[in-house]
Design a protein with these regions (language model features):
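Cleavable N-terminal export/targeting peptides
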Residues: 1-30
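Beta-barrel outer-membrane channel/assembly domains of diderm bacteria
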Residues: 22-130, 167, 332-344, 389-430
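Short loop/turn motifs that connect adjacent beta-strands in outer-membrane beta-barrel proteins
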Residues: 24-33, 46, 91-104, 126-134, ...
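Transmembrane beta-strands of outer-membrane beta-barrel proteins
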Residues: 34-42, 105-107, 136-140, 175-181, ...
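Outer-membrane beta-barrel proteins
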Residues: 44-48, 113-115, 144-148, 185-188, ...
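Surface-exposed coil loops of outer-membrane beta-barrel proteins
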Residues: 48-76, 117-120, 127-232, 405-415
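Detector for outer-membrane/organellar transmembrane beta-barrel domains
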Residues: 202-358, 363-371, 375, 420, ...
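C-terminal structured domain segments
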Residues: 360-412
């Protein structure tokens, strides 16, 4: 995946605390500043596992990103295996007049360069009978479903656009928005994929389970549509996504299951650098358990099944027919006291490919183990800031490169390879 766009997968921000529930905060008058940051240094004398991933991180960590993983920036978990990242959020709430509340939000990020990822305004109370409905317009992260341990969005519609969120319709909160590509990966003179994203959230089910349902549709729009010599429609067919999420628990003990079906797209309609298979099915199960007050286990299983018919192979410049990705990550955390803790993160990942030429069929697999001794501001699982001193070992076995595009710059060694990284990193949010 291109370096200048891969940073979007790293953004957790305060979503680490919000990934299991979505609720619009009240727009308060005045200025607010908050953010998220992580950074570190790795040292490894072993051959580079994945040159593209190593360049993406640019911090010395010998990143384990399994060959053929098109879904997350790192494999086997993010601890001791990720790039540096910064988000600075600035929010200005205006004085409440006429029972309305208005706000302006900006988000400046830094991965390998500064960028203004979000700039939008929002308003509550525009409709007096539906005062909780929030209208917005601008540039923002939108309709995201986060996964924590492998730091990715299983669903998103980030972009420039407008919409309405959290209209109470009785059964739940209804949201709808229109967005187009935020990161300018396509030629804006030709056009872009435009997504209409909708959701009905916080549907209460028995046994304290909450249900969210999602339905998104995307189509190519722009000057190229009226150009008889353009193949923009062929390369960007209409797409849709249907998904649901089940959640039970709170920030400290929870389980979540997410299932998504995508047609002519992957995890996001507006991230136009992602592959566009004829269909893709994603399933994710994640959770956190406090076994005791000081010992916790976090876990995630991730699955993507992508199928490429002839048209999809043509527009993606690939010879793969099917790709089955499975990833399992387990993080154990033991707090010794208010100042120190130890974490052990293990992960296994596999991608099985079938190709138009059976000789190119194969399974790529690998695993990662990270042991980290931590210094932190408190003993809670979510307490930050934290400094981690870690050692990471990764092993990767590559049987096929059929997933590569004809213009890929990814440098991957066939066969088995391994690498060890020692280093330190910090993580903070405020």
């Amino acid at each position: 995946m291109p370096k200048k766009t891969s940073f979007v997968f790293n953004s957790l921000t305060l979503g680490l605390l919000c990934s299991f529930s979505h609720a619009s905060s009240v727009i308060e008058p005045g200025f607010e500043f908050h953010g998220y940051a992580k950074g570190g240094l790795g040292i490894s004398n072993d051959p580079i596992l994945n040159a593209e991933a190593y360049d993406w991180a640019a911090n010395g960590m010998n990143i384990f990103r399994l060959a053929g993983n098109r879904y997350s920036d790192s494999s086997g978990g993010r601890m001791g295996n990720e790039a540096n990242w910064l988000e600075l959020h600035f929010n200005q709430g205006f004085t409440h007049d006429h029972d309305m509340a208005w706000g302006l939000n900006a988000n400046i990020v830094y991965g390998d360069e500064l960028a203004l990822d979000e700039l939008y305004t929002q308003a509550d109370g525009v409709f007096t009978q539906h005062s909780n409905a929030r209208f917005w317009a601008g540039k923002r992260y939108y309709a995201r479903v986060e996964t924590v341990l492998n730091d990715m969005q299983a669903l998103s519609s980030d972009g420039l656009g407008f919409g309405m969120d959290d209209l109470d319709v009785g059964a739940g909160l209804f949201s709808i928005g229109v967005t187009r590509n935020l990161y300018n990966e396509t030629n804006l003179e030709s056009g872009d994929m435009v997504a209409v994203s909708s959701s009905l959230r916080k549907i209460v089910l028995p046994k304290q389970i909450e249900l969210d349902v999602f339905a998104n549709f995307g189509t190519f729009m722009g000057p190229a549509v009226s150009d008889d010599n353009s193949n923009a429609r062929e390369l960007n067919p209409n797409a849709y996504q249907l998904a649901f999420k089940l959640h039970r628990g709170d920030y400290f003990n929870n389980d979540e299951f997410f299932l998504r079906y995508s047609h002519n797209t992957s995890m996001s309609i507006t991230r136009t650098w992602q592959q566009t298979p004829s269909y893709q099915i994603g399933a994710f199960y994640q959770g956190l358990k406090h076994i005791t007050e000081d010992y916790r286990i976090a876990y995630i299983w991730s699955h993507e099944n992508a199928h490429f018919d002839e048209a999809a192979r043509k527009r993606n410049y690939t010879e793969q027919v099917d790709a089955h990705w499975n990833s399992l990550v387990l993080r154990n955390s033991l707090a010794w006291n208010q100042r120190t803790s130890t974490e052990i993160e293990t992960g296994y990942e596999q991608v099985r490919f079938t190709a138009t030429d059976p000789a190119q069929d194969g399974t790529n697999s690998g695993y990662k183990l990270t042991v980290s001794q931590n210094l932190h501001a408190g003993s809670g699982y979510w307490d930050r800031p934290v400094i981690r001193f870690f050692i990471t070992y990764a092993n990767m076995d590559v049987e096929t490169l059929v997933y590569q595009h004809s213009n890929d710059g990814e440098q991957i060694k066939m066969g088995e390879s391994e690498a060890t990284t020692i280093g330190a990193q910090f993580e903070a949010w405020w």
